[in-house]
Amino acid sequence: MPSERCLSIQEMLTGQRLCHSESHNDSVLAALNQQRSDGILCDITLIAEEQKFHAHKAVLAACSDYFRAMFSLCMVESGADEVNLHGVTSLGLKQALEFAYTGQILLEPGVIQDVLAAGSHLQLLELLNLCSHYLIQELNSFNYLDLYRLADLFNLTLLEKAVIDFLVKHLSELLKSRPEEVLTLPYCLLQEVLKSDRLTSLSEEQIWQLAVRWLEHNCHYQYMDELLQYIRFGLMDVDTLHTVALSHPLVQASETATALVNEALEYHQSIYAQPVWQTRRTKPRFQSDTLYIIGGKKREVCKVKELRYFNPVDQENALIAAIANWSELAPMPVGRSHHCVAVMGDFLFVAGGEVEHASGRTCAVRTACRYDPRSNSWAEIAPMKNCREHFVLGAMEEYLYAVGGRNELRQVLPTVERYCPKKNKWTFVQSFDRSLSCHAGYVADGLLWISGGVTNTAQYQNRLMVYEPNQNKWISRSPMLQRRVYHSMAAVQRKLYVLGGNDLDYNNDRILVRHIDSYNIDTDQWTRCNFNLLTGQNESGVAVHNGRIYLVGGYSIWTNEPLACIQVLDVSREGKEEVFYGPTLPFASNGIAACFLPAPYFTCPNLQTLQVPHHRIGTI
C-alpha cells in the first residue's frame, strides 16, 4: 500500500488569531522592578540628597517627559551614568520611582508634599493625578485653604476645582464657624466662588455683605470693581438695592459699582421685559434643573392651580414613595387645564386653557401669567387676543407664539398671535391655512414646528408645518406617518419625536397610538422608531432635559381615566434608546403642562444634581 503523506502543521491549521497575555505587562514590569532592587542591568543612577537610586533609562523615559528629554536629546546627562537631581528630596524620588515601576504608591500625610514636589519636577503626570485624588478625599473645613495653596503651587487643577466646589457648598457653614478665615481667602479663590451658579446657600444680599467684608479686610480695594461684577444685584429686591447697596460708601465711591446697582434698579422697573433682559447678574443661582408640573384636571373635574417641582433630595425612598418628592410652590392665580407653558429667560409663562367658573361651567380663556422663580410669585401679563385651549405655545428669541386651539365657544381657530414682553402686548401674525386644535408643537432649530391636530370639520391631520418668524410664513414639510391628535412633540438634537395621541380606525372609532415616530430636520424624513410607549397617553404635558423626553400625565381612552404616570424616553444614545416609567405624579391629571426650570434654591438650598428615579423596564 502506498504510504500516506504526512501533513505539515501549516497545512493542518487555518486562519489567524490575535492572542493576548493578560499577565505579560505586569510580569515584565515586575521583573524590571526586581532588577532595580537588585541593582542589575540598570543603566542610570539617580542621586537626590546624596542618596543613590538605580533605574532603567527606558522605564523612566516611558513615564516622564522630563526624563525622555534628558536621555534622548543632546544633553549632558544623556550619556552620564549618574545624574544629580536638584529640587527633589530623596524621599520624594524613592516614592516616585516606586510608582514608576509598580503603578502603585502609598500616600500619607508624611510623604505627600515630597511626592508632589518630585512628581511636579519630574513631570510624572499620572502620579500628580493620584495625589490630587488623595487630597480631594482628605478635603475638609480645616484644611481647604492649605490644599488650595498646594493646588496652586503644583498646578493641580482637579484639586483646585474640588476646593472651589467645597467652598461653594459649605460657605454658609464656614461663615458661621470660621468667619475670619473666610476673609483671608485669596482673591482668585473668592472670585471663582462668587461667580458660581451653584452658590445657593446664601442670599444675594449675604453674598454682597461677604464681598464688602472681604474688601474691607486688609483693604483689598484694588479688587473692588472686578469683584462686584460677580454680585447679582438683579436678584436683590428694590428696597435692598436702595438701603443696602446704593447708599453704601463703597458703591458711592465707585462709578462701576454705582452703574451695576443702577442697572439692577432699571431691570426691576421694566417688569414685563425682564425675561428678554436677562444677564449673568440677573440669572438665578441654582444647583440643577428639575421637572415642574403646572395645572391640570383631576378626576373630580376640578381645575388645578398648583405649581409643583420634583425634589430628589430624598434619594433613599425616591423609588418607593416618589409622590413624597413633589414639593409645592406658589399656585397660579386660577386653576386651569389644557393650557400651555413656555420658558423664556428662566421665567415660566402660562397662557390660555380651560377654567371652571362659579356656575360649574368650563370654557377657554385668554388670560396669561408669568412665574418668577427668584421670588416664587406670579404676575398677570396682557391677555391673548383669542381665548384658547388645546393649542400650542412656543418661545422663539424674544417672543411667545400662540397657535390655533379652541375658543370659548369651542370653535376651532386658524389664528396665530405673538407676545412681545418689552411691550406686554399680543399681535396677530400669519394664520394657518385652516383651523386647527389638539395639535402638538415644539421649538427647534429656531423655528416653531406644528404636527397633527383636528380641523373645524373634525378631520384628523398628519401634516407637519413649520413657522419661519423672519419671513412670517408657514411652510409645509413631509407629513407624519399617521394622523395624530391629542399627542405630544419634542426635539432632541436635530430630531423631532411625536409621542402618544390617538387616531381613527376604519369605523371612525378612536384608537390609541403607542408608536413613536422621529423626524430628521436635515433630511425632511420620518422614521418609525423600533421602540414604543409602554402605555398610550393623550393630553399629556411634555418636557425635555439632557436627551430625555418626559411625557407627563394625560388621559387613557382605554380606561377613560386621567393618568398619574410619567414615561421617559431616553434618546441620548443612538441605538440604545430606552423607554421607562419615571416618578408618579401626586395625582392623576390630564391637560397638565410640564417644563424644566432651575430648582428653587430658596426652598431647598442643598438640592443636588437632578436624578429622576425610574422603574426601568429594560433596554428596547
Curated annotation (Swiss-Prot):
The Kelch repeats lie at 290-346, 347-398, 399-446, 447-494, 496-547, 549-599
The protein's UniProt keywords, in alphabetical order, are: Kelch repeat, Repeat
Q: Gene3D superfamilies this protein is in?
A: 1.25.40.420, Kelch-type beta propeller (2.120.10.80), Potassium Channel Kv1.1, Chain A (3.30.710.10)
Q: Which residues form the BTB domain?
A: 42-109
State the Pfam families in the record.
Answer: BACK, Beta-prop_ATRN-LZTR1, BTB
Q: Does the keyword Cytoplasm apply?
A: no
Q: Which CDD domains match?
A: BACK_KLHL32_BKLHD5, BTB_POZ_KLHL32
SUPFAM superfamilies given in the database record? Kelch motif, POZ domain
The record's listing under SMART domains reads: BACK, BTB, Kelch
PANTHER family, A to Z: KELCH-LIKE PROTEIN 32, LD33804P
What is the protein's name according to its record?
Kelch-like protein 32
Native source organism of the sequence: Homo sapiens
